[in-house]
Amino acid sequence: GNTIVDPCCGTGSFLEEVILNDPNDGAYNLCGFEILPTPYMLSNYRLSIVSRQHGAGAHTENIMLANTLCNGMFGEAVDESTIEGAEIARASTWAEMPLKLIVGNPPCSDSMRQNIDSEFSFINGLMDDFRPPRTVRRARQNIQKQINNPFMQFIRWSCEKLLRAQNNSVLSLVVPLSFLEAESYRYARKYLMEHFSNIWVVPIDADARTGIRSNSLFHTLQGRAVIILTRKFGEDPGFSEYQFVDFSKGSIAEKENYLNQDINQVIGQFRTYNIDASTLAFYPSKPFDEDKYNLFWPISDDNDHNAIFMNHCSGIKLAPTALFTH
């Protein structure tokens, strides 16, 4: 059957929902990888309760205690005589199967560099695909800061596994709302555009740090969105438009109602937008006076055009400099 993976399954809530939303009792392999022992145990317990309440079903369940991003998950030899090594080897076997669907809510943190030592050399090598071209890279470049954010690494890991599969496949992940349009993620969006066939975008929570009141489903100040990408095997990949519906402005009850609708009702609410070649954003731009905007100089420019500052240095925005950088 098909193989479905949550590469950062936590306590198993996404895996539980896959089972509960499968009325036809499909014969698929359901796999979850989790690095922390406590969530790993809770996810196993959670799925055992689901099986007890709803029957074992035709699917198989495998929750493994493994670091999804380590080299062992890409086929590097591990010491299987240890519990950790045996779990990684087992997880790697499942991850190398033809995957149909990857779902999850990957961890997100830009406050520290993670997974950067030699044990993670494979995923770090793959992250080059999310960087700017070498010709425009510079030291201390802010747009490269997010490369070591775990959620970015999980996106790239998921892409690598799905693109190897010789079948149609789907990637559905929760991402920070800023991923949809921030310049820091421009080249990650470009990679997705070039390697998948279609995308659906659903903002769920607004970014509360901007001062906008938001009734958030996710317990974080940072906004959240869901991206759903499909890949048609055997066809040339690539898309230049996206399907978009915004649920971020409703109350929690309204959001839950939206998300629990029949899929045919939800699909009808999406609108199609062309992707702006200058930003590669997955978020519609708000209307503005373009002629007036073009009268002004940018803060800086990399193409020797008129700009307020000829040189710039990345740094922390403090109160005295907020006037120039906000």
Where are the regions a protein language model picked out?
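Sequence-level detector for compositionally biased, low-complexity segments
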Residues: 97, 114-116, 141, 160-326
